[in-house]
């Protein structure tokens, strides 16, 4: 039995006044829930966590922390053409990452246009978002540039907290402050009506803003946590006919988390960084999509993945290689 697919288009997003990815998903799929964490929002789908929900952009996996945490704020809603949600297990096609479901974001890449757009929003607690897009597409060549900045001061509901049977003062926030930057660039080239190429790259960072630890009050921290990622990719598509396509895609991602010390601690001075985790992800896929009959689609493909993680305490890299071939109909 096929799993149900929900689709929300750019026009529906605009009419509903949706400004972020979390709002769009909440409207689409009642089985989705969110709760805040250091990476932004922790997603739950059909009772399963981020780790078992596959998030794709134009069919390519979005990577984050190895535990499955992905900062959903890095999805630029001004670029979204539509969002497709496969609500239910899809592990036979996508692997164990997709036991809870699949979310695929399709972005808009207009042709024969020179356009610049700016989108800003400001809400309570000094929550600010600014997005900039520049599209230059003429003839066979296209360039699509995006930048998004997000900031929040964080807040606390009460300056008091329980400590056993006592009520004491605290500076611990209910929601952490943060600042993030997200830059992406994509180039496309249509060599012929049948053959096209693309190359893309991006940079992302997010820094948390905790209150500094103090001796006279609880709730402070010795350090802030920062997250940083680079990604790059390239691919080609050859159209044998209207319903028959051969496609190659490669993507890479480096992701690191660090402590930025606020006070002198563990041999580090204020302002110095300590690496806590480094991840590398590489994925290469060659596939063919064929419409042998009017009402069916058949895929044949091979996929190679390499994942690497390094922790400073071990000073060693651990690698995992995965090769697979598939042919669902």
Task: Show which residues each predicted segment covers.
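Periplasmic-side early beta-strands and strand-to-turn transitions of outer-membrane beta-barrels
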Residues: 104, 111-113, 121, 136-225
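N-terminal periplasmic "start-of-domain" segments of outer-membrane beta-barrel proteins
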Residues: 1-12, 42, 50
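Short acidic/polar hinge/loop motifs at secondary-structure boundaries
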Residues: 60-87
């Amino acid at each position: 039995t096929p799993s149900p697919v929900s689709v929300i288009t750019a026009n529906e997003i605009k009419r509903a006044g949706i400004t972020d990815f979390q709002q769009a998903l909440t409207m689409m799929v009642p089985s989705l829930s969110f709760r805040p964490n250091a990476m932004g929002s922790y997603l739950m789908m059909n009772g399963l966590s981020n780790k078992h929900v596959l998030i794709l952009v134009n069919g390519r996996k979005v990577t984050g922390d190895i535990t499955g945490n992905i900062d959903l704020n890095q999805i630029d809603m001004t670029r979204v053409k539509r969002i497709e949600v496969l609500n239910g297990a899809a592990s036979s096609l996508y692997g164990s990452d997709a036991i809870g479901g699949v979310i695929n974001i399709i972005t808009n890449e207009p042709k024969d246009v020179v356009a610049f757009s700016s989108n800003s929003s400001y809400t309570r607690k000094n929550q600010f978002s600014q997005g900039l897009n520049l599209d230059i597409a003429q003839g066979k060549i296209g360039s699509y540039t995006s930048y998004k900045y997000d900031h929040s001061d964080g807040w606390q509901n009460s300056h008091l907290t329980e400590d056993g049977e006592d009520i004491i003062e605290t500076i611990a926030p209910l929601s952490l402050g943060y600042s993030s930057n997200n830059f992406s660039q994509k180039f496309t080239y249509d060599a012929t009506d049948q053959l096209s190429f693309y190359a893309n790259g991006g940079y992302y960072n997010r820094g948390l803003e905790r209150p500094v630890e103090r001796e006279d009050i609880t709730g402070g921290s010795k350090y802030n946590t920062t997250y940083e990622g680079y990604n790059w990719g390239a691919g080609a598509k050859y159209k044998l006919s209207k319903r028959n396509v051969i496609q190659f895609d490669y993507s890479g991602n480096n992701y690191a988390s660090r402590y930025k010390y606020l006070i002198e601690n563990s041999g580090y001075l204020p302002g110095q960084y300590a690496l806590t985790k480094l991840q590398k992800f590489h994925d290469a896929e060659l596939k063919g999509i064929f419409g042998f009959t009017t009402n069916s689609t058949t895929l044949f493909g091979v996929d190679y993945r390499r994942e690497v993680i390094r922790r400073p305490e071990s000073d060693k890299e651990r690698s995992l290689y995965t090769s697979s071939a598939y042919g669902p109909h």
